[in-house]
């Protein structure tokens, strides 16, 4: 039976869990309005759709600048990879209509760090609060927005956008799911039915074991080590940049001082010669 593996990504508070419930047609993920996120761990749920087994992975706060605090051991990041192995067919980047903020951009950067920039070719931008369009076209909204970061994101995703009203029920909710899953199915066919993969997913396949928790722990160690190595590399590059900039400023100051001194010497000499005449 063919599968559609989907991962809900984006910053916390955009309605990822509610979006997952809309796709699945029932309440599988805990979803509640509030300032404090309710999703604490990556969770997998599935449904049948048009002969496909659709598997949806809901994610907690692992796509923000607070990752060192929210997922210090990279356990939930590793769980996301394990649950979506051998790789997702699409990422659903969830954002709220009219509220694409700096936090959304930071979440996007985190998605690229974790999955690789190439994953944008497998990404669909999903806007929640479709009802706020009030009957207007989503395409017109995206085309006319003055939010440059949002326009760039949509372009990077090949224009794949969809809007959901997560309060919809019954036939309206199912029609929304049909539209989104149909878009994902077309995306999968464009890639010859193949799922997305990267080095981490290959490592997940190599660390398969009987106990899923043991596998998550092993993958978490690998991911944490990679992130620490990247942090050390960036710190080294930043230190070199500061050293270079400091040295350049010092050298420029010396050069400028010498130039001024030479100018003053020649200027005074020339001025004195004019007076002697």
From Swiss-Prot:
Q: Name the residues that span the membrane.
A: 251-266
Q: Which InterPro entries would you find in this protein's record?
A: G_AIG1, GIMA/IAN/Toc, P-loop_NTPase
Q: What happens when the gene is disrupted?
A: Severe lymphophenia, leading to death soon after birth.
Positions annotated to bind GTP: 10-18, 31, 129-131, 166
Q: Where in the cell is it found?
A: Endoplasmic reticulum membrane; Golgi apparatus membrane
- UniProt GO BP: B cell differentiation; CD4-positive, alpha-beta T cell differentiation; CD8-positive, alpha-beta T cell differentiation
User: What Gene3D superfamilies would the database entry show?
Assistant: P-loop containing nucleotide triphosphate hydrolases
Topological domains annotated Lumenal = 267-277
* UniProt topology in membrane: Single-pass type IV membrane protein
Main subcellular location:
endoplasmic reticulum
Region span, G3: 58-61
Cross-referenced CDD domains:
AIG1 (cd01852)
Q: Which GO terms describe its cellular component?
A: endoplasmic reticulum; endoplasmic reticulum membrane; Golgi membrane
PROSITE patterns of this UniProt entry?
A: G_AIG1 (PS51720)
* AIG1-type G domain residues: 1-205
The organism's superkingdom is given as Eukaryota
For this UniProt record, give its keywords in alphabetical order, as a comma-separated list. Answer: Endoplasmic reticulum, Golgi apparatus, GTP-binding, Membrane, Nucleotide-binding, Transmembrane, Transmembrane helix
Question: Per the similarity annotation, which family is this?
Answer: Belongs to the TRAFAC class TrmE-Era-EngA-EngB-Septin-like GTPase superfamily. AIG1/Toc34/Toc159-like paraseptin GTPase family. IAN subfamily.
Name this polypeptide is given: GTPase IMAP family member 1
Native organism taxonomy:
Eukaryota, Metazoa, Chordata, Craniata, Vertebrata
